[in-house]
Design a protein with these regions (language model features):
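Bacterial N-terminal signal peptides that target proteins for export
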Residues: 5-24
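Intrinsic disorder/low-complexity segments
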Residues: 34-37
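Hydrophobic, well-structured mid-protein blocks that either form specific transmembrane helices
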Residues: 117-162
């Protein structure tokens, strides 16, 4: 059965740019690799990387760069950013890994140019509480210690796959986003080959479930590259945003087809 999506109503250039910026952020669900400075089995599986993606939205192309590093405090710093015409963005997620789970510390999104919007999440202000900046207002959200941000949520999936790939058919993650908490559910569709600028890549295909029938999100992860994301497609109101990997380094080595 073919899904059908209604076309959005006409909007102003500023509103279109704002929606495009938000779609790009939604597309960048991820955050994609770690370096663990701590010792142990899970630390050895997590490695730093830099990845370049070609992102296409409404006929426009832009390059998006993601980078994952670790500091001397055993914190992981994941950055994400790109620019198209008069719209740009930069994101940073800071977290640590404890007991095979990501523990969020902070998240900041900064829009630039026409859409100068800022969002923040702070997970360590007080025990059991997240402070969130959304549309120039601060909100308090409950935290159970495992709440993620919209960037590092994909890292939790990767982490579990790296530890036991046979056990992750689907996963539900608790996400703090704006003034609310929500559950993000990812379901394994199967194994697929994706054709990229690097050549054909064997991947695992996951679908993100949405309550809204006008939204659809799919991601493809490469097991041979520590489950690095090689493709993502997000559709909202019939308008797709697609990201495809064009190049990457993993633990300082250029990735290549094996």
């Amino acid at each position: 059965m073919v899904s059908r999506y209604r076309r959005p109503a006409l909007t102003t250039p500023k509103r279109r740019a704002e929606r495009l910026s938000l779609w790009l952020v939604a597309a960048l669900i991820g955050a994609v690799a770690f370096q663990a400075a701590a010792s142990g089995r899970q630390a050895s599986a997590l490695r730093p990387y830099t990845a370049e993606y070609k992102t296409t939205a409404r006929g426009f192309d832009l390059s998006v760069t993601r980078k994952l590093e670790a500091d001397d405090n055993n914190h992981f710093i994941l950055t994400n950013g790109g620019k198209i015409l008069v719209v740009g963005f930069h994101e940073i997620s800071v977290f640590r890994v404890e007991d095979e789970e990501i523990r969020s510390i902070s998240y900041i999104y900064q829009g630039t140019g026409l859409v100068n919007r800022r969002q923040e999440l702070h997970f360590d202000a007080e025990p059991g509480k997240i402070t969130s900046l959304y549309k120039d207002q601060w909100y308090d959200l409950p935290d159970n210690g495992s709440t993620l941000d919209r960037m590092n949520q994909m890292e939790q999936l990767r982490l579990e796959l790296l530890q036991d790939p046979a056990s992750v058919d689907d996963i539900t993650l608790r996400i703090a986003d704006g003034k609310r908490l929500k559950d993000s559910q990812l379901v394994l569709i199967g194994e697929e080959t994706q054709h990229t600028a690097l050549g054909p890549v064997a991947t695992l295909h996951y679908e993100r479930l949405h309550d809204d029938p006008d939204r659809k999100s799919d991601i493809w992860l490469a097991p041979q590259w520590d489950y690095l994301m090689v493709r993502m497609v997000h559709i909202e109101d019939g308008d797709p945003v697609e990201m495809v990997l064009t190049g990457a380094t993993l633990d300082g080595e250029v990735v290549a087809i094996q």
